[in-house]
Protein backbone atom coordinates (compact mmCIF):
# COMPACT_ATOMS: atom_id res chain seq x y z
CA UNK A 1 0.00 0.00 0.00
CA UNK A 2 1.47 3.39 -0.97
CA UNK A 3 1.83 6.37 1.34
CA UNK A 4 -0.99 8.07 -0.55
CA UNK A 5 -3.23 5.04 0.00
CA UNK A 6 -2.38 5.08 3.70
CA UNK A 7 -3.28 8.77 3.87
CA UNK A 8 -6.60 8.18 2.13
CA UNK A 9 -7.33 5.34 4.57
CA UNK A 10 -6.49 7.63 7.48
CA UNK A 11 -8.72 10.41 6.23
CA UNK A 12 -11.63 8.28 5.03
CA UNK A 13 -11.83 5.54 7.65
CA UNK A 14 -9.89 5.99 10.82
CA UNK A 15 -9.54 9.69 11.37
CA UNK A 16 -6.33 11.10 12.79
CA UNK A 17 -4.50 9.28 15.57
CA UNK A 18 -4.18 11.64 18.53
CA UNK A 19 -0.92 9.95 19.57
CA UNK A 20 0.93 10.68 16.33
CA UNK A 21 1.49 13.85 14.39
CA UNK A 22 2.80 13.20 10.93
CA UNK A 23 3.36 16.32 8.88
CA UNK A 24 2.60 14.56 5.61
CA UNK A 25 -0.90 13.81 6.93
CA UNK A 26 -1.77 17.44 7.73
CA UNK A 27 -4.16 19.40 5.54
CA UNK A 28 -1.87 22.42 5.25
CA UNK A 29 1.07 20.30 4.13
CA UNK A 30 -1.00 18.42 1.55
CA UNK A 31 -2.54 21.66 0.25
CA UNK A 32 0.93 23.21 -0.03
CA UNK A 33 2.23 20.22 -2.00
CA UNK A 34 -0.78 20.36 -4.33
CA UNK A 35 -0.28 24.12 -4.72
CA UNK A 36 3.42 23.64 -5.52
CA UNK A 37 2.50 21.09 -8.19
CA UNK A 38 -0.06 23.46 -9.69
CA UNK A 39 2.40 26.40 -9.71
CA UNK A 40 4.98 24.20 -11.44
CA UNK A 41 2.45 23.26 -14.13
CA UNK A 42 1.46 26.93 -14.44
CA UNK A 43 5.09 28.01 -14.90
CA UNK A 44 5.63 25.36 -17.58
CA UNK A 45 2.70 26.74 -19.60
CA UNK A 46 2.81 30.45 -18.74
CA UNK A 47 6.38 31.22 -17.74
CA UNK A 48 6.30 34.98 -18.16
CA UNK A 49 3.51 35.70 -15.63
CA UNK A 50 2.98 34.63 -12.05
CA UNK A 51 -0.36 33.13 -11.00
CA UNK A 52 -1.27 36.36 -9.11
CA UNK A 53 -0.48 38.45 -12.21
CA UNK A 54 -2.58 36.13 -14.34
CA UNK A 55 -5.43 36.33 -11.80
CA UNK A 56 -5.36 40.13 -11.95
CA UNK A 57 -5.51 40.15 -15.76
CA UNK A 58 -8.26 37.52 -15.84
CA UNK A 59 -10.41 39.38 -13.31
CA UNK A 60 -9.92 42.71 -15.13
CA UNK A 61 -11.06 40.92 -18.30
CA UNK A 62 -14.24 39.94 -16.44
CA UNK A 63 -15.07 43.17 -14.59
CA UNK A 64 -13.37 45.91 -16.58
CA UNK A 65 -11.96 48.99 -14.92
CA UNK A 66 -12.06 48.82 -11.14
CA UNK A 67 -10.27 50.25 -8.15
CA UNK A 68 -7.00 48.74 -7.08
CA UNK A 69 -8.52 47.82 -3.70
CA UNK A 70 -11.58 46.20 -5.28
CA UNK A 71 -9.37 44.17 -7.60
CA UNK A 72 -7.46 42.92 -4.57
CA UNK A 73 -10.70 41.86 -2.93
CA UNK A 74 -11.90 40.11 -6.08
CA UNK A 75 -8.70 38.07 -6.43
CA UNK A 76 -8.17 37.45 -2.69
CA UNK A 77 -5.06 39.60 -2.24
CA UNK A 78 -4.22 42.16 0.39
CA UNK A 79 -3.62 45.78 -0.64
CA UNK A 80 0.19 45.59 -0.54
CA UNK A 81 0.33 42.43 -2.63
CA UNK A 82 -2.10 43.65 -5.27
CA UNK A 83 -0.19 46.94 -5.54
CA UNK A 84 3.00 45.03 -6.32
CA UNK A 85 1.22 42.86 -8.87
CA UNK A 86 -0.30 45.92 -10.57
CA UNK A 87 3.03 47.76 -10.56
CA UNK A 88 4.70 44.84 -12.35
CA UNK A 89 1.86 44.52 -14.87
CA UNK A 90 1.96 48.27 -15.50
CA UNK A 91 5.73 48.13 -16.10
CA UNK A 92 5.06 45.51 -18.78
CA UNK A 93 2.36 47.63 -20.42
CA UNK A 94 -0.45 45.19 -19.60
CA UNK A 95 -2.49 47.48 -17.33
CA UNK A 96 -2.92 51.21 -16.94
CA UNK A 97 -3.79 53.30 -13.90
CA UNK A 98 -5.97 56.37 -13.71
CA UNK A 99 -7.43 58.50 -10.93
CA UNK A 100 -11.10 58.23 -10.04
CA UNK A 101 -13.02 61.23 -11.44
CA UNK A 102 -14.63 62.14 -8.11
CA UNK A 103 -12.28 60.70 -5.48
CA UNK A 104 -8.79 61.54 -6.74
CA UNK A 105 -7.24 59.38 -4.00
CA UNK A 106 -8.66 56.22 -5.60
CA UNK A 107 -6.60 54.54 -8.28
CA UNK A 108 -8.44 52.72 -11.03
CA UNK A 109 -6.81 49.89 -12.95
CA UNK A 110 -7.74 48.62 -16.39
CA UNK A 111 -6.32 46.40 -19.10
CA UNK A 112 -4.40 48.01 -21.93
CA UNK A 113 -4.95 46.72 -25.46
CA UNK A 114 -1.79 44.66 -25.01
CA UNK A 115 -3.10 43.31 -21.70
CA UNK A 116 -6.42 42.35 -23.29
CA UNK A 117 -4.61 40.54 -26.12
CA UNK A 118 -2.38 38.75 -23.62
CA UNK A 119 -5.20 37.49 -21.41
CA UNK A 120 -7.29 36.35 -24.38
CA UNK A 121 -4.29 34.37 -25.62
CA UNK A 122 -3.63 32.91 -22.15
CA UNK A 123 -7.16 31.79 -21.21
CA UNK A 124 -6.93 28.57 -23.28
CA UNK A 125 -3.58 27.81 -21.61
CA UNK A 126 -5.17 28.38 -18.20
CA UNK A 127 -7.81 25.79 -19.05
CA UNK A 128 -5.03 23.34 -19.98
CA UNK A 129 -3.26 24.09 -16.68
CA UNK A 130 -6.42 23.31 -14.72
CA UNK A 131 -6.95 20.08 -16.66
CA UNK A 132 -3.33 19.01 -16.15
CA UNK A 133 -3.46 19.85 -12.44
CA UNK A 134 -6.54 17.66 -12.07
CA UNK A 135 -5.25 14.84 -14.32
CA UNK A 136 -4.65 12.37 -11.45
CA UNK A 137 -8.38 12.56 -10.64
CA UNK A 138 -11.36 11.10 -12.45
CA UNK A 139 -13.94 13.60 -13.70
CA UNK A 140 -16.16 12.79 -10.72
CA UNK A 141 -13.26 13.14 -8.27
CA UNK A 142 -12.22 16.44 -9.86
CA UNK A 143 -15.75 17.83 -9.50
CA UNK A 144 -15.90 16.69 -5.87
CA UNK A 145 -12.43 18.08 -5.18
CA UNK A 146 -13.32 21.48 -6.62
CA UNK A 147 -16.58 21.58 -4.65
CA UNK A 148 -14.77 20.70 -1.42
CA UNK A 149 -11.98 23.22 -2.03
CA UNK A 150 -14.57 25.93 -2.65
CA UNK A 151 -16.22 24.97 0.63
CA UNK A 152 -12.89 25.34 2.46
CA UNK A 153 -12.15 28.66 0.77
What is the role of each PLM region?
Residues 46-50, 81-84, 88, 138:
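Short glycine/proline-centered loop/turn elements that form peptide/ligand docking sites
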Residues 32-35, 58-62, 123, 150:
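Short, locally clustered residues in the helix-turn-helix/winged-helix DNA-binding domain
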Residues 25-29, 36, 49-58, 69, ...:
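Short alpha-helical elements of helix-turn-helix
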Residues 1-48, 111:
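N-terminal leader segment of winged-helix/HTH proteins
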Residues 72:
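The alpha-helix within a helix-turn-helix
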Residues 39, 65, 87-150:
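Charged, amphipathic alpha-helical coiled-coil/dimerization segments
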Amino acid sequence: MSGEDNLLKLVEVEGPDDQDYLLQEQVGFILRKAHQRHVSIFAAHIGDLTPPQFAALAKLRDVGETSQNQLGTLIAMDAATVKGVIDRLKARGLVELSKHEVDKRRLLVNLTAEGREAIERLIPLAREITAETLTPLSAKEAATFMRLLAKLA
